[in-house]
Amino acid sequence: MTLEQLQEHKNIEPDISSFEYRPKPVFDLFKRLFDLVVSFVCIVILAIPFVIISVLIMIDDRKAGPIFVQDRVGKNGKIFKIYKFRTMCANAEEKLAELQKFNEMDGPVFKIGNDPRITKIGKLLRASNIDELPQIFNIFLGHMSFVGPRPALPKEVEQYRPSDKLRLLVIPGLTCYWQVVKNRNSVSFDEWMELDRKYIMERNAWIDIKLIFKTFFFLFKKSGC
């Protein structure tokens, strides 16, 4: 996306007159207890698989560690460190500038198919979404929740319009409405933001449970299980 296109995108403000944010302290308490208990159980169960995956990543590319740590923007704009299994080469961030012209997403988001920076084991981890599992530690620490808008990069948030920043009203999550959309990379940035605003207005325990089950179904279907 060119600078001119990005500036044009930023100046087009969607109609959010129907958006309404309501604090839900009881739901937030239930959500935090659920996140804390389930993430702890997952950490215990996945401890050995985490070690095995880490070793495989190191064998595939020894130039960097198995865990990728990056700044992300959380609730109310607070910055936190997100954890993921490393799926790209050690100098992936340095190569980003030369790949920007191939960006397949609109808005302040970068995604391309067949990214040349992805390692062999990284392709497998991404195809199964296993690379996202270390975010369970973020959930346990309270940086994230199982359900909520996906956490954005600080440089992306800097380009947000006021309507886009509404997604920062709640704790970011591991999955969301956008995450379970078929061919989600074909979803426009504005549609993505609208899905996040929809979740913020409608959020409740039943929606969270449905999204968690939909995510598991989506992953199993995607992997052919």
What residues fall within each predicted segment?
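Hydrophobic structural segments characteristic of membrane proteins
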Residues: 1-16, 65, 133-225
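Short, glycine-rich, amphipathic interfacial segments at transmembrane boundaries or analogous
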Residues: 3-10, 67-116, 175-194
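Juxtamembrane loop-helix boundary motifs flanking transmembrane segments in multi-pass membrane proteins
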Residues: 14-29, 113, 117, 152
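A hydrophobic, helix-centered structural microdomain
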Residues: 22-92, 210-225
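Short phosphate-engaging motifs
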Residues: 51, 95, 117, 132, ...
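Cytosolic nucleotide-binding catalytic cores of signal-transduction proteins
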Residues: 126
